[in-house]
Regions:
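Short catalytic/ligand-binding loop motif for oxyanion handling, primarily in non-cytosolic enzymes
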Residues: 1, 19-24, 89-90, 125-128, ...
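Structured beta-strand-rich core segments of catalytic domains in phosphoester-bond hydrolases
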Residues: 1-78
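Loop/turn elements at helix/coil->beta-strand transitions in domains of secreted/extracellular proteins
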Residues: 7-11, 75-80, 112-116, 138-141
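A cross-domain feature marking catalytic cores of carbohydrate-active enzymes
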Residues: 15-16, 83-85
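Metal-dependent phosphoester-hydrolase catalytic domains
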Residues: 33, 92, 96, 103-117, ...
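Sequence/structural signature of outer-membrane beta-barrel proteins
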Residues: 48, 88-89
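Active-site metal-binding loops of divalent metal-dependent hydrolases
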Residues: 84-86, 120-122
Length: 177
């Protein structure tokens, strides 16, 4: 759907299964505006380079993070984006997944100092204890803290839960959400 409807964009990422199919945590970026400098997809697990791997106690679905480093051709700035879909069933898997993403971003010796945007469906609410991981990373700020409910369109009903997040580090200015 993304590739068919966002023709001015490239969509990068791969499927989460061992065969690199199924759901993706893709990143879409405008072709004319961004230069892709680096891209990686890794599994949220103790073996991040093994396709389809999972944390113990996690749901049956493997979870991934797609990361990319871009150069904004208009602004001349470099920044990193990480997009993920954390586990829906395992509290420990969500906590470890978020920690893994933030640590992975920090451990990059080449692009480690660039501004970072971490986005995704974290499958947790802002006040859940899994979000305490953020206390270990005070250089990251949750800029979606007060935006209210996010809507994904999968089901109808009265679910008033905010489970989608945008966490930033560095000189990031958000003009709209």
């Amino acid at each position: 759907w993304l590739k068919e409807n966002l023709t001015d964009y490239y969509v990068i990422g791969c499927g989460r299964s061992a065969e690199l199919r199924d759901e993706q945590s893709a990143i879409a970026y405008r072709k004319e505006r961004m230069n892709l400098m680096k891209m990686d997809t890794y599994w949220l697990s103790e073996t991040p380079d093994v396709p389809g791997s999972r944390y113990p106690g996690q749901s049956v679905c493997p979870r991934i993070c797609t990361e990319a480093v871009f150069e904004d051709l208009e602004a001349g700035k470099v920044f990193r984006v990480a997009n993920a879909h954390l586990d829906n069933a395992g509290e420990l898997a969500r906590r470890k997944g978020l920690e893994q993403i933030l640590e992975n971003v920090k451990s990059d010796t080449f692009f480690g100092g660039v501004p970072v945007i971490v986005t995704g469906d974290f499958n947790m609410e802002p006040d859940w204890k899994e979000m305490e991981v953020m206390k270990n990373h005070p250089d990251f700020t949750n800029i979606t803290e007060n935006i209210g409910v996010t809507y994904h369109g999968y089901w109808k009903g009265n679910d008033q839960t905010c489970i989608d997040f945008m966490i930033v580090r560095g000189s990031i200015r958000c003009e709209s959400l």
